[in-house]
């Protein structure tokens, strides 16, 4: 049984497509381009004189379990940052 030129071309193109898809896919958690997330929000609990880091931690944790929060006393804002690097 001979392999036709059309069948061989189809097979090669399928393999190339599969390989390029695997290289471009970022479905594995923890693999790929990691970016540091940092964003600050106005939160009443971070206003002076009452600075409540626990409230900021809860606020950021509600946005995503990958974030932690800390009140920035210089700007009076709650800053959420990523736990992973």
Curated annotation (Swiss-Prot):
Transmembrane segments annotated in the record for this chain: none
| S-S pairs | 40-80, 46-71, 56-78, 60-79
Keyword Iron-sulfur on this protein? Answer: no
An example Gene Ontology CC term for this record: extracellular region
Q: Name one GO biological process term.
A: defense response to fungus
| Signal peptide as annotated in the record | 1-24
Q: Where does this one sit in the cell?
A: Secreted
Q: Which UniProt keywords apply?
A: Antimicrobial, Disulfide bond, Fungicide, Plant defense, Secreted, Signal
UniProt key word GTP-binding:
no
Q: Which family does it belong to?
A: Belongs to the DEFL family.
The protein in question is named Defensin-like protein 112
Q: Which organism is it from?
A: Arabidopsis thaliana (Mouse-ear cress)
């Amino acid at each position: 049984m001979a392999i036709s030129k059309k069948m061989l071309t189809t097979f090669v193109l399928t393999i190339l497509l599969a390989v390029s898809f695997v290289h471009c896919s970022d479905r594995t958690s923890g693999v790929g381009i990691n970016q540091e997330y940092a964003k600050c929000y106005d939160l009443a609990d971070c206003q002076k004189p009452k600075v409540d880091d626990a409230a900021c931690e809860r606020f950021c944790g509600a946005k995503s379990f990958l974030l932690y929060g800390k009140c920035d006393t210089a700007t009076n804002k709650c800053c959420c940052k990523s736990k992973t690097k």
